[in-house]
């Protein structure tokens, strides 16, 4: 009798644990630039306030950085780290690939999707591989309409409250950055080696991208998506920023479209079971 009761209690505990198990989802999104409209009356000359950058998760930055590192390993000169001192001492051109380097800022235009290895787990939030996308046909549809896709990505994530859910940092499109300036100073130590003789200091403005912003997805009975995306564009000699800010309640499995005079977003949140 005790054995039967113990088994019943164990079964109840397993059932309770299963009922309260954390659900996982995957989101896929495409962001694209809208066609210029000469009838547009909205004024984007006022620069929007900086976004609240709390609880940030830089999935895309890490993914694009891995993409740049792979290009370096494949022999791309743009992404190779030049070893100036080794070149002087050996008389030969030398370069290396450092997995800890910042390869993202070496892109003039970011790829449409970051290159990541396909994963299947529920350990932490991670990016989708291109083979796990469902929206490839929509990219072609946008291009046929003359629209320019800036980013096609997705990630898997557990259900979290509004307070705990991270803000996923979004970057895409071409780079907007001021040119670098350099100053060279000679070290005072007369016994310095060649590699330490000169101190080259780089003064560089922060790199910005055509598409930047944050997306947060949290669960409270329903799925809620908070979208704050900035699109930079050229207006004569000026660079303007148009912001899309939307808060949307969505259902898993439905395809949703966020509209803005300068920017469009298509996304779908799907249930994920490993």
Protein language model features and the residues they cover:
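Generic hydrophobic segment detector
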Residues: 1, 74-80, 94, 263-274
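Bacterial N-terminal signal peptides that target proteins for export
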Residues: 1-7
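Feature for long, exposed domains in two main contexts
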Residues: 9-10, 267
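N-terminal signal peptide c-region/cleavage motif recognized by signal peptidases
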Residues: 14-18
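Extended, low-hydrophobicity segments enriched in charged/polar residues
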Residues: 21-242
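A cross-kingdom marker for long, charged
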Residues: 246-274
